[in-house]
A protein has these predicted regions:
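Hydrophobic transmembrane alpha-helices
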Residues: 1-54
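Alpha-helical transmembrane segments and their cytosolic interface
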Residues: 1-7, 150-187
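Hydrophobic alpha-helical transmembrane segments
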Residues: 6-11, 35, 39-43, 54-59, ...
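Structural signal for membrane-spanning alpha-helices in multi-pass inner-membrane proteins
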Residues: 16, 20, 24, 45, ...
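Short helix-perturbing small/polar motifs within transmembrane alpha-helices
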Residues: 18, 78-132
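Interfacial aromatic-anchored transmembrane helix boundaries in multi-pass membrane proteins
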Residues: 20-33, 61-95
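Alpha-helical transmembrane segments and their lipid-water interface positions
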Residues: 53-60, 68, 99, 136, ...
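Interfacial helix-loop-helix junctions of multi-pass membrane proteins
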Residues: 68-74, 138-153
Length: 187
């Protein structure tokens, strides 16, 4: 891994942390807050690709695990990894990988801007929405005993916001591809 890769991983981990400063919103009917950090996970996958995006999220999770208050709401420490919303945190790693992998495979420099943006959006939805929510629902059902149908129904409230975040990530991925073409997509 080059110095450039390390800097990009650290930069995007810092972006995820910064997005955690936006106060989370609790909906009340499910014990999972709505926050902006999942946007950072999608951005890491879309912009950095599978390897560096996954390493970015792994670094972010390590910072949270050692107790730094990097999660939304100023949370950190090993205890947050056992709480009901922890499945979504585990899903961040899967989300970054899936988003990055699909972005690397679907998006090429020869495509038109609309096609690139559409593929970035598909990748962000597949990783940042489907993969992350799958991990979150499975963990939520396991920890709370809700059962899969109830956990799934509870997570549906978050899907529209996450689709909006995927759209933002797609626009950002397209902008980076146009504005900074020297950033290698594959590492």
């Amino acid at each position: 891994m080059s110095t450039r890769d390390l800097v990009l991983v650290a930069l995007f981990a810092a972006i995820i942390v910064a997005l955690g400063l936006i106060p989370p919103v609790n909906l009340g009917f499910i014990p999972v807050p709505v926050h902006a950090q999942s946007l950072g996970v999608m951005l890491a996958g879309v912009v950095l690709g599978a390897k560096r995006g996954t390493l970015t999220v792994a670094l972010f999770m390590l910072l949270a695990a050692i107790g730094l208050p990097v999660l939304s709401g100023g949370r950190g420490g090993l205890g947050v990894f056992m709480a009901p919303p922890s499945g979504y945190l585990y899903g961040y790693i899967v989300a970054a990988f899936v988003t990055g992998y699909m972005s690397e495979r679907l998006v090429t420099a020869r495509q038109t801007g609309l096609v690139q943006g559409s593929y970035f959006f598909v990748a962000a939805v597949a990783g940042g929405v489907f993969a992350c929510h799958l991990c979150g629902v499975l963990w939520l059902a396991f920890v709370t005993g809700l059962g899969l149908p109830a956990a799934f129904m509870g997570t549906l409230a978050f899907v529209p916001g996450d689709v909006l975040k995927a759209l933002i990530a797609a626009f950002a991925g397209r902008a980076v591809m146009v504005g900074y073409p020297l950033l290698p997509q594959r590492a």
